[in-house]
Amino acid sequence: MWMGVGDSSGSPKPIRIVVVGEKGSGKSSLIMAAARNTFHPNIPSLLPYTNLPSEFFPDRIPATVIDTSSRPEDKGKVVKEVRQADAIVLTFAFDRPETLDRLSKYWLPLFRQLEVRVPIIVAGYEVDNKEAYNHFSIEQITSALMKQYREVETSIQWSAQRLDQAKDVLYYAQKAVIDPVGPVFDQENNVLKPRCIAALKRIFLLSDHNMDGILSDEELNELQKKCFDTPLVPCEIKQMKNVMQVTFPQGVNERGLTLDGFLFLNTRLIEEARIQTLWTMLRKFGYSNDLRLGDDLVPYSSFKRQADQSVELTNVAIEFLREVYEFFDSNGDNNLEPHEMGYLFETAPESPWTKPLYKDVTEENMDGGLSLEAFLSLWSLMTLIDPPRSLEYLMYIRFPSDDPSSAVRVTRKRVLDRKEKKSERKVVQCFVFGPKNAGKSALLNQFIGRSYDDDSNNNNGSTDEHYAVNMVKEPGVISDTDKTLVLKEVRIKDDGFMLSKEALAACDVAIFIYDSSDEYSWNRAVDMLAEVATIAKDSGYVFPCLMVAAKTDLDPFPVAIQESTRVTQDIGIDAPIPISSKLGDVSNLFRKILTAAENPHLNIPEIESKKKRSCKLNNRSLMAVSIGTAVLIAGLASFRLYTARKQS
């Protein structure tokens, strides 16, 4: 158990094995002995690339073995080869202790400095004069080294008298690449690593067809045939159970193999040097060397879209996620607590929301738990901004479909939405623009139920973008008509934000928030609106724009209401929406944003394109506008002042 081993890689690309070490440590001799099955006492100081065909190795995967120079002046060439290596063979000679010392004093520290993260095999060259090293085994000699440098997979001894050992060195180097120990097993503590446990749990649950938490004899046989194309005979299963009852009683019962027993069996495979069997099973279920699902399993064609299209979860995926939530919300209190979330993602490499991007982006309960609305909102956000990651994690939590692409859909182009004068998008992305201290972060806090003075979303001078996501729904239960709103705060750089056309095309609605008590804040917000609307119009990806008058708990600047109303009327958008995050009064802003998105043909600023404006600028100069008078020229005075300033 398991019986039979198939090809665990299937990759035709040759594996690059780079041989490194001090002069006289046997680098070139090792390569020559392995490749030609003969020992040459007189060989060149540096061999050319040695290509070993697939027939050379049991796994029938070719390799290119690269000799390196020991001369200090050739260090740059060695570094280049090491950076491109799939595996490194680090050599020393038993009769030259200084070559062993250099492994820990120079070569291994160098590899760490270069951040080389490939398997390393230490090869000890045994000379004829055995008294030179007093019959110490290579395990005794290298044990301290391997404890200090865990990247060393194994150490192997070879000699000119036993040429098959030279082949073994290269074979182990290749196997360390094809079936690496490092990702799956903690050799210091002799336990499976967390990612390997997660992958094996997923395989166990996928193989447990009746979902009783046990792999029956029939289910074990199906797993065996899937992975190795060879069934188990009844006596083999019986023998496995008998051994398990003696060595690990909790691993088996009268109905079959438990999850703990399954993990125990796979641990034994590694301890018995049968790691290839484990990797064969992992790869049959789509895992790559980093124990994530391979790119070939993620249907990237499902995400092909134009710049003004987005990706959303389908109703099938949403219903699946609801069922998952209800299953792991063990007490049914509509609060998926952190430990319950941990159980949910036990079959994934880690939680998908550990990245800083997802920190503090949705509403959390006092204990850090998530309501169903917040849970679904996070999935919608991940699907919007990183569709492959979303689909990958749906597969980790066992989305029940042979076609993973059925979990997502690409929305209609926004240009077609405008022609139809309606949008059916269920996830709306709203870009939040505004000058510094206008109240952007406070608005995002308000949206996800955080306090007005919570500074977790404050940019603190950062130019990074920040998200907040939540469902905007009518009171009552969640329905298919509820929509998810994503607020994306666009941080302002010192030289202006100047988002690219492609970045702006993803915007469904833009709001421009300003401090209603500060005239400069108002003028800056108008400048931003003009710039954004112009870029959008020139690119052909226009979208509704709204002005938001924040901090209405403060006294407005003189003629604020009259001026803001006149400007918005002249450019064809709604009057500014008054809000006060401090008082918790947002005037139903979030519903108004969704309404604007549902009517993509409205609230489009009437702004001239740069081309038309350039022609007019050649024929007349722009009039200056005095502070407080706000005399508009065709409703675009603030915009033209901004343009004149940019061109001066």
Curated annotation (Swiss-Prot):
Tissue expression as described in the entry: Expressed at very low levels in roots, leaves, stems, flowers and siliques.
Primary location recorded for the protein, binned into one broad class: mitochondrion
TM helices/strands, residue ranges: 622-644
Domain EF-hand stretches: 195-230, 316-351
Mitochondrial intermembrane side: 645-648
Localization terms from the record: Mitochondrion outer membrane
Membrane topology: Single-pass type IV membrane protein
Biological process (GO), any one: mitochondrion organization
Functional note: Mitochondrial GTPase that may be involved in mitochondrion development.
Name of this chain's protein: Mitochondrial Rho GTPase 3
